[in-house]
Amino acid sequence: MIDVHVKGVLYGIAAALPHMQRRKAGHFINVSSVAGHKVGVNNAVYAATKTAVRVLSEGLRQEVKPWNIRTTVISSGAVATELPNSVSEPDIARGIGQFYETYAVPADSFARAVAFAMSQPEDVDINEILFRPTRQAL
């Protein structure tokens, strides 16, 4: 999880940042999670990686202002993705699968959040969007 959720974000930033700085424009969209705001049982490491994405993004936001680069973190609740299939512990995977079957919203909901952040005027920086399915308590 650390390699994908934390190092992957860092590598993506490192690859794109020089190009955005040259253009004096750009927009990073980093993916966190509701888990980055609230830790639940059996997901401390996942929550830690998603919290790291939020913290890295906030630091990046402050550092890239001279180049007119925007930074948005999308923290979502349950979205219909492959996440439930990536859990290796059978009991936890079963629980997550049932949770997602009950609560997950379509991936299009996530796409609309991204489109909202990107469609703002150049002088507006939507720093964070936190959304959940209406029925999701966590």
Model regions: which residues?
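A hydrophobic alpha-helix adjacent to the NAD(P)-binding/active-site core of NAD(P)-dependent oxidoreductases
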Residues: M1
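Active-site helix of classical SDR
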Residues: I13, T49
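Residue(s) in the substrate-gating loop at a strand-loop-helix junction
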Residues: S33
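Active-site-adjacent segment of SDR/Rossmann-fold oxidoreductases
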Residues: K38, G59-I69
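Active-site loop immediately N-terminal to the catalytic Tyr-X3-Lys motif
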Residues: K38-A44
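C-terminal helical subdomain
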Residues: I69, V73-I74, T81, A93-A137
